[in-house]
Amino acid sequence: IAHRDRMRALLTQERAARQTVNRFFASQLSEITAAMESGRKDASEDFWQRISSGQGLTFDVTAIRAAAMDALNQLIDWNQQDEALLRTLNPVWEEAFNTGAKSIEQNFGITAVRAPRLTDYLRQQGLKRVRGINETTRDKIASALADGIEAGESTAQLVKRIQQHLPDMQAERAAAIATSEAHTSMQAGSFAQMQYGGCTTKTWITAGDEDVRDSHRSQNGVTVPIDQPF
């Protein structure tokens, strides 16, 4: 029962996180394409001037990709994008963390001496993941731009390429990101609740069905100190 309850709670967190990440990606795409259409981030940095440097290098795929990435890096402030995504995911982390902590108390009766909180360390780990998410977005856009440049597309066609292809890619990523972020934060909340509740050990217990991996089945029943990996 406890396992089913936790799985239901996790799925609820994943759905909410996926909606949040999808909204961020949609807003980010609008900002990127608007900047592409205006041609510049500010008066001194012309996006299409940088792109055009790649359009004369159609024989060199590496040079085209480098030119596309250089132009993209100058298009918008990616540090601000990191900060925006961090603000977006903070409530996701908090909610999933608290859900994980509550599930341990409700299902196992483990009461913490004091309420666990999402620590600065966990937020810093989250910031690393945020930067990785935006780096992947940059890579995907740069790759799409490079393909368009190789195909001899106009600037308008390049913008259209991004508008048409990026949403599908980002939707798939949003699902994976939501699963990862919700699971990581729920596990962190559960672990913190057990620590604050005075637990000193943890025991690996499998679901006991045919879906259990051999490597996990061999760990069934193994007990280790709570702060050590299995």
Listing of model-derived features with the role each one plays in the protein:
Residues 1-169:
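N-terminal leader/targeting and assembly helices and adjacent pre-domain segments
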Residues 169-230:
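Acidic, glycine-rich two-metal-ion catalytic cores of nucleic acid-processing enzymes
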